[in-house]
Regions:
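Short, small-residue-biased leader/transition segments that mark boundaries at the very start
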Residues: 2-7
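Extended ligand-binding groove/face enriched in aromatic
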Residues: 10-27, 43-153, 157-176
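Glycine-rich, aromatic-lined ligand/substrate-binding cores of catalytic
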Residues: 32
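Aromatic-residue-lined binding/catalytic grooves and analogous aromatic/hydrophobic interfacial grooves
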Residues: 35
Length: 176
């Protein structure tokens, strides 16, 4: 699928990728996250080994795309020299415009929490925690952090859900 191609390119970035043509919108990362969330709700009611295995195969494509510090935003990192035009020159620089970095985080976390609740697996949850930890380190009011406000409430809602899932208050504080 197009989404799996994006994550495969992210796992192997290149300055030859024309991200704007390959990925029309900077929020395309959310499509597999929301699909996994929906499939996880199905698994809660109708356990299905084949569906669970399929979700795991999608997560196997997503996981290698995550950067070492937890950041996962393919609109920027497929081609770090020439990211998607909505992404800006550096992380978080266009968050209040069109980048959707925190929007993507929100949908990832919601999908990951639903997957964990349905399966007990931390596979997706650990990916989401790593990205949320990156956000906690890099976004906020403190010196050296990007002081930005997301354009959608999904990031804050998801961080609250991550707090409920993990008990870690730093996610609740970041949501505030």
């Amino acid at each position: 699928s197009a989404a799996s191609d994006v994550y495969k390119r992210q796992a192997h970035p290149s300055d030859t990728y024309d991200v704007g043509k390959l990925m029309p919108y900077s929020f395309d990362d959310t499509d597999p996250y929301k699909t996994i969330e929906g499939a996880s709700y199905v698994l809660q009611t109708y356990p299905d080994k084949k569906l669970k295995a399929y979700i795991d195969s999608v997560l196997d494509i997503i996981a290698p795309a995550q950067e070492a510090d937890g950041y996962l935003y393919t609109a920027r990192t497929q081609n770090p020299k020439h990211p998607h035009f909505w992404a800006g020159d550096k992380r978080w620089s266009k968050e209040e415009d069109l980048s959707h970095e925190l929007y993507n985080l929100g949908h990832m976390v919601e999908g990951a929490v639903a997957h964990w609740q349905a399966t007990g697996s931390r596979k997706f949850l650990d990916i989401a925690i790593r990205y949320a930890d990156c956000v906690v380190r890099e976004v906020g009011p403190n010196p050296g952090q990007a002081c930005v406000v997301p354009g959608h409430q999904i990031a804050e809602m998801a961080l609250c859900k991550l707090y409920l899932a993990t008990g870690n208050k730093k996610y609740l504080e970041e949501a505030k």
